């Protein structure tokens, strides 16, 4: 996928916004550039779906939002986390509160390394994932990454009562 972007860098600018699973990536950029990209993808018979989003998330076009976030986050007093946190920027464990602040800012312009994050967690002993909130998108992505892990979704109060850990 990156090769396709590199080959066409003079025709349009698009960045990988999400690496969700093998065969599923999300690209981000200006609408006009994404339209050109869609044309290229269709000509190569590569399946694509234009997502209805309000901004070019997780790419360099979010620079202004990054600066706003930087100013706001620096005002906050974070505490060290008692639980392990995995950054979607690095797909690795966040080591301390200062790194957490930096990564929360960086994630605005950088791609989400979902697939790598899930692999990191599995390789470090996580074998049960619980998705909280409407839908099952993340659960589906996790199952595409590794069918052997246990997954649950919690959408209702009864889902909580039925949850078996």
Go through each PLM region and give its residues:
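Acyltransferase
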Residues: 1-144, 152, 158-165
């Amino acid at each position: 996928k990156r090769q396709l972007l590199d080959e066409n860098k003079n025709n349009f600018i698009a960045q990988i916004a999400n690496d969700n699973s093998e065969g599923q990536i999300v690209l981000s950029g200006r609408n006009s550039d994404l339209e050109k990209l869609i044309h290229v993808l269709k000509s190569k018979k590569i399946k694509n779906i234009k997502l209805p989003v309000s901004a070019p998330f997780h790419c360099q076009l979010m620079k202004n939002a990054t600066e706003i976030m930087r100013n706001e986050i620096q005002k906050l007093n974070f505490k060290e986390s008692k639980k392990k946190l995995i950054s979607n920027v690095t797909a690795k464990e966040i080591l301390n509160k200062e790194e957490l602040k930096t990564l929360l800012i960086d994630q605005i312009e950088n791609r989400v390394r979902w697939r790598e994050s899930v692999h990191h967690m599995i390789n470090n002993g996580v074998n049960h994932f619980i998705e909280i909130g409407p839908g099952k998108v993340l659960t589906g992505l996790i199952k595409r990454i590794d069918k052997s892990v246990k997954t649950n979704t919690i959408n209702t109060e009864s889902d909580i009562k039925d949850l078996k850990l």
